[in-house]
Regions:
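A short, glycine/small-residue-rich beta-strand->loop->alpha-helix junction that serves as a flexible
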Residues: 11-29, 47-52, 226-229
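Conserved catalytic-core segment of nucleotide-activated headgroup transferases in glycan assembly
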Residues: 201-204, 212-263, 274-278
Length: 390
């Protein structure tokens, strides 16, 4: 932990008013413990700043400033090479103006696409000698799912830009185990990836709540009901189940790409209106198993906020096996059932034995508890201070 007074500059150009609020709070808490004497300045669009500021009112030494978000001009899409480049250049100018002449310990870009990777990350050594951490949320995973047919647009997206090396002072910050290794396979020349396991807020922890003695086991899909998160698989799973001792729920908001699905079999359906964080967490506390049919390759490159919510509530998983879950299990032990395919998922649920679940559950919950403890901001702070290295 450093005692000299320095400054940490944080920039979130991508998040809308409510996007990534829990993580941004968690990250601020990690930084506050890691560098207790530093001044922290957080910049984002005005609505995001207004929502985040009261969440960290108990922390001192943090200033908030509104800034222009990543906005392609002329109504252009962020996938448009010209629009994305112009928006990224504007973000870079904002960062340059904010850090010039400051006693900077660290700058962090809280979300990065291909445009920001090129304009800010690859050019950072021209801006500052301080370290820059670019936090990888779902942008690389999204780029693995959909890519433009336009060759110029493809050359500027993150799936292409990730192959370009970064200055030594710039790190791409992965938020889950296994992501670094997945990027190493995709882009062997990129040696800039470091890992900060996704923090989990102590204020959102739940105590263990065993299933009701003779009630139904409640299996839930969490978060935005997008196809890429596997909601269509979950809806089909619920519709195909003929078991009266299982109850299927969707806790989160509806998504346009799955709006056509039949969800009449769900005891709780995706919400048509915004859902408060408190209502969401209360609903998660009331279920028994979290189903994460993350079948897309995107989740080899993405930290799942849904998994963090399951850990916070100590809820075991039924999930598709992927690189991140393999890495989590290798470090902490099993946290539920992992399946290889949709067919295996359907078979597992059709044959799920309550007694077998109850017998395995104590070990799973103990491992979830170990993950939760390790990912407290206070526990992550020392390692992150070393990672920053200043």
């Amino acid at each position: 932990m450093a005692a000299d007074l320095r400054e940490i500059a944080l920039f979130d150009f991508i998040s809308h008013e409510t996007m990534h609020l829990p993580f941004n709070e968690e990250y601020l808490r990690v930084l506050r413990v890691a560098f207790p004497s530093d001044r922290i300045v957080f910049r984002a669009r005005a609505g995001h700043v207004a929502n985040l500021k009261p969440r960290v009112a108990d922390l001192g030494g943090i200033d908030f400033e509104a800034c222009e978000p990543f906005t392609p001009p002329f109504g252009l899409s962020s996938h448009n090479p010209l629009g994305g480049w112009l928006a990224a250049q504007n973000c870079r100018r904002t960062m340059e103006g904010a850090v010039q002449g400051r006693p900077l310990r660290l700058a962090a870009l809280l979300g990065v696409d291909g445009n920001l990777y090129a304009a800010v990350g690859r050019q950072w050594s021209k801006v500052s000698s301080a370290p820059l951490h670019m936090i990888l949320h779902g942008q690389l995973g999204d780029a693995m799912i959909w890519r433009s047919r336009n060759p110029i647009a493809r050359a500027t997206d993150l799936a292409s830009q990730i192959h370009h090396s970064l200055p030594a002072s710039v790190k791409l910050l992965a938020l889950e185990l296994g992501v670094k290794e997945a990027i190493a396979e995709l882009a062997p020349n990129n040696r800039s990836v470091v890992t900060l396991e996704h923090p989990i807020l102590v204020s959102e922890w739940s105590e263990e709540s065993p299933p009701a003695g003779d009630g139904k086991l409640k299996v839930a899909f969490l978060g935005n009901a997008r196809r890429s998160k596997g909601f269509e698989v979950f809806a089909n799973l619920a519709r195909s189940s003929e078991r009266d001792d299982l109850q299927f729920e969707s806790i989160g908001v509806a998504a346009p790409d799955t709006d056509h699905l039949d969800v009449s079999m769900l005891a709780r359906r995706p919400s048509r209106t915004a859902m408060s964080r408190r209502d969401y967490l209360d609903a998660v506390r009331a279920i028994d198993l979290v189903c994460l049919p993350l079948h897309s390759r995107a989740y080899d490159f993405t930290a799942s906020g849904t998994f963090a919510d399951a850990v916070s509530a100590l809820k075991p998983l039924i999930a598709f096996r992927n690189r991140t879950f393999d890495a989590i299990v290798a470090k902490y032990g099993p946290v539920g059932w992992l399946v290889e395919s949709e067919a295996e998922l359907f078979y597992l649920v059709s044959t799920l034995d309550r007694d077998a679940f109850l017998a395995a559950r104590p070990e799973w919950v103990a491992n979830l508890r170990a993950i939760r403890e390790a990912r407290r901001p206070e526990m992550l702070a020392a390692g992150y201070s070393t990672l920053v290295g200043r």
